[in-house]
C-alpha cells in the first residue's frame, strides 16, 4: 500500500545520524519537521523529562557536535551550547508531549523509514 507523503523521504533520511551506535535525529531537525521552534520542542521535553530516559534522548558531547557540524551544510550547530538527539523511541514519545496533529503525522512518517 502506498502512503501519501507529508515530508519527502530523502529529507527525513538526511536528518538521521548514527551516534553512539544509535540512529538518532537532532532536536533542531525534528523541530523543523514538526514546524515548531527548537526552543518549543526542548521546553516540551523538559516539562516531561520522565518520558525521555537516556535510551530515548541524550545530549551530544562537544566532540560529537563538532563531528556532526562538519557534515551539516551551513550549520551553526557548532555554536550551540546544547544539542539533544532522539532515538526512534524518543521520536515516538515526542508526539505525546507536543500534542499536535502535525507531530503525530510526522512521527508516523519517520517510523515508516
Regions found by a protein language model. Give the residues of each.
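Basic, low-complexity intrinsically disordered segments
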Residues: 1-113
